[in-house]
UniProtKB/Swiss-Prot annotation:
Record's protein name: Elongation factor 2
Gene: fusA
Record: residues binding GTP: 28-35, 94-98, 148-151
SUPFAM superfamilies found in the cross-reference section: EF-G C-terminal domain-like (SSF54980), P-loop containing nucleoside triphosphate hydrolases (SSF52540), Ribosomal protein S5 domain 2-like (SSF54211), Translation proteins (SSF50447)
Keyword set includes DNA-binding: no
Predominant localisation class: cytoplasm
Length: 727
């Protein structure tokens, strides 16, 4: 039997022993060494050749990833590691660190119970490290720390042992500060990482060695030995004495929870149903014999097998041919194949039980975040939707070069929207022009060149990138009337800014649009009061839609109940296209103050009420001192002091604001923010300005008001582009 076949056999037998399973992710800032680390773990576990590890980047198996040298998608793999005399099954997900692909990280967090946070010893904590840690802790995923690229501190920066220790202490303190700040209440103080207990390891993923205090005690290697090996440039021998996979996977097994332990506190966090019900108990206890329930965390397109769903099972088991229910879209599907991931390959297995991550084919309708369960299980509500911290801020229009490719292009776009819920796709079959909104230039480029051009073979024309703006109100409008086309129905609205606490809670995912479908009015009211809304107003909330709220302030209007859905529909249409530039509104509170309806239902149908509400709400917003908001990016630049002036000049030319500066040695770190609209082509420009000597990264920083002097011009440009009147 080949080594690989033996590995598959081990994986299958270990799937049933829950205390020997670990579902883990590796997450970090871009280029801090996640994929190199993953490769060496695989090599240690016998999955790929040791000589190739680190160069092979087995989990970057997409051509686009290999070419760019970065991880774009989250890759999955299962492997076996011997620890404390017992074999353990480790399901590993390697996630991207580039800010444009953060959506993949968010979805991967739903599938795992523990995370190895990788921090580069040279750069320290970076913005994306903080973002991925926040996502992990929000999903109650326990972190451990690996400080990578330690050899560079010795060989390049020539730090003394004392400076080395100080650098490590600073990184550990910074990580713990973030963990303490963002941990769920019950884990404050318990989840901090600690050198002495072995929840921190140091090493070099590229040179394949690592060390932790427990491993030092076991092997009698000292820190002085490590310094000597690095300075003598003999890291190969060090890798034999302290192999990366042994140190790291021991740390994973010792410090990260198995699925039975993790699901006890993770299920109440992601599922708001009755935990005492049969399905509730089965999920909390990770029961393989209970009803089947799981969540699709990722959709992968395969040329031969079609859509493959990566699924984390919380209870029950899935066999080939099982019928499944897709809860959110109320559809049925059949699991045509059940497999485990081995990097780019999938290996078929007879069945997969609770607590594991598997690959399913046959779930054509499923999208990332979908809840799956057995057909006779009532899993209500479905799992909490997977919320992501950033928003799509750049849009491009695309058209097929050949009209015969149009149907194919529409299929591909629908598939992309299912695979990646951070992409917004608007399909216009009449004009043939379709809009894709993504997280940044690179995100859009990968979608248009790779997913549409390379994978689907559709040639497309891509328009100039357009920035996504928002509209918001800064004052309170008078009472504004909306009349139906037949003049028999009148509704009166007031628009004003939404309370900041409510808007922030919506951004953080504490209240969601779908709460109004899933929860009782009383539950919604309690939740709104908890986050700081006035109880009188909380009672009267009709709906929340994309960060805007509609309240019913009327009393005793008989026909209002039957008109309710139409009023909500009209409100949604109005805030989807604001009055200034037909951009989405955000942070607007609209109050329905009064309404007069025709007593005959035939005269107050959808064709009458929706336009009445739409014009009334839009006019109220227009009279509440409406202004434009633009998306902002936080920009972090680390540059040698000689080039600091050039880097700052490049930022100020792009309406950038310097927020903070820190100096360490001859390197300066600049923290700043700049509008997305000014950041096109920044990558090339900043490399030119600093002769390629700087490191830089960006992350989404929310929306801010457009400067008053620039607003008229921007509004005019948007309206012209959309074919609206500009006078």
């Amino acid at each position: 039997m080949g080594r690989r076949a033996k590995m598959v056999e081990q994986v299958v037998s270990l799937m049933e022993t829950h205390d020997q399973i670990r579902n883990i992710g590796i997450c970090a800032h871009i280029d801090h060494g996640k994929t190199t680390l993953s490769d060496n773990l695989l090599a240690g576990a016998g999955m790929i050749s040791k000589d190739l590890a680190g160069d092979q980047l087995a989990l970057d198996f997409d051509e686009e990833e290999a070419e760019r040298g970065i991880t774009i998608y989250a890759a999955n793999v299962s492997m076996v590691h011997e620890c404390q005399g017992k074999p353990h099954l480790i399901n590993l997900i390697d996630t991207p660190g580039h800010v444009d692909f953060g959506g993949d990280v968010t979805r991967a967090m739903r599938a795992i119970d523990g995370a190895v946070v990788v921090v580069c010893a040279v750069e320290g904590i970076m913005p994306q490290t903080e973002t991925v840690l926040r996502q992990a802790l929000k999903e109650k995923v326990k972190p451990i720390l690996f400080i990578n690229k330690v050899d560079r501190l010795l060989n390049e920066l020539k730090l003394t042992p004392e400076e080395l220790q100080n650098r490590f202490m600073k990184i550990i303190a910074d990580v713990n500060k973030l963990i303490e700040k963002m941990s769920p209440e019950e884990f404050k103080g318990k989840w901090v990482v600690n050198v002495m207990d072995g929840s921190v390891a140091f090493g070099s993923a590229y040179h394949n060695w690592a060390i932790s205090v427990p491993y030092m005690q076991k092997t009698k290697i000292t820190f002085k030995d490590i310094i000597d090996y690095c300075e003598a440039e003999n890291q190969k021998e060090l890798a034999e004495k302290a192999p990366l996979h042994a140190v790291l996977l021991d740390m994973v097994v010792t410090h990260l929870p198995n699925p039975v332990e993790a699901q006890k506190y993770r299920i109440p966090n992601i599922w708001k149903g009755d935990l005492e019900s049969e399905i509730g108990k089965a999920m909390v206890n990770c029961d393989p014999n209970g009803p089947m329930a799981g969540v699709v965390t990722k959709i992968i397109m395969d040329k031969h097998a079609g859509a493959i769903s990566a699924c984390r099972l919380f209870s029950g088991r899935i066999k080939q041919g099982d019928e499944l229910r897709l809860v959110s879209i109320k559809a049925k599907a059949r699991a045509q194949q059940v497999a485990v991931f081995m990097g780019a390959e999938r290996v078929q297995v007879p069945s997969v039980s609770a607590g594991n991550i598997c690959a399913l084919t046959g779930l054509k309708e499923a999208s990332a975040g979908e809840t799956v369960c057995s057909p006779n299980t009532i899993l209500d509500p479905s799992f909490e939707s997977i919320t992501h911290v950033s928003e799509p801020v750049i849009t491009v229009a695309i058209e097929a070069k050949n009209t015969k490719d149009l149907p194919k292009l529409i299929d591909v776009l629908r598939q992309i929207a299912k695979e990646d819920n951070t992409v917004r796709v608007e399909i216009n079959e009449e004009t043939g022009e379709h809009l894709i909104s993504g997280m940044g230039e690179l995100h859009i480029e990968v979608i248009t060149n790779t997913k549409i051009g390379r994978d689907a073979g559709v040639e497309v024309d891509v328009g100039e990138p357009i920035v996504v703006y928002r509209e918001a109100v800064n004052g309170v409008s008078p009472e504004v009337e909306g009349k139906s086309p037949n003049k028999h129905n009148r509704l009166y609205f007031v628009a004003e800014p939404l309370d900041e606490c409510v808007y922030n809670a919506h951004v953080e995912g504490l209240i969601k649009d779908e709460d109004f479908k899933k929860k009782t009015p009383k539950e919604v009211e309690t939740k709104l009061v908890e986050i700081g809304m006035n109880r009188e107003e909380a009672k009267r909330v009709m709906t929340i839609y994309e960060g805007n709220v509609l309240l019913n302030m009327t009393r005793g209007i008989v026909q209002l109940d039957e008109a309710r859905e139409l009023i909500i529909e009209g409100f949604k249409e109005a805030v989807k296209n604001g009055p200034l530039a037909a951009e989405k509104c955000q942070g607007v509170k609209v109050k329905l103050m009064d309404a007069v309806f025709h007593e005959d239902a035939i005269h107050r149908g959808p064709a009458q009420l929706i336009p009445a509400v739409r014009t009334g709400v839009r006019d109220a917003i227009a009279q509440a001192n409406v202004g434009l908001l633009e998306p902002i990016q936080n920009v972090y630049i680390s540059t040698p002091q000689d080039y600091m002036g050039d880097a700052m000049k490049e930022l100020s030319n792009r309406r950038g604001q310097i927020l903070d500066m820190e100096q360490e040695g001859d390197m300066t770190t600049i923290k700043s923010k700049a509008p997305v609209s000014e950041m096109f082509g920044f990558a090339g420009a900043i490399r030119g300005a600093t002769q390629g000597r700087c490191l830089w990264s960006i992350e989404f920083g929310g929306f801010e008001k457009v400067p008053t002097e620039l607003q008229p011009q921007i509004v005019k440009e948007i309206r012209t582009r959309k074919g609206l009147k500009t006078d």
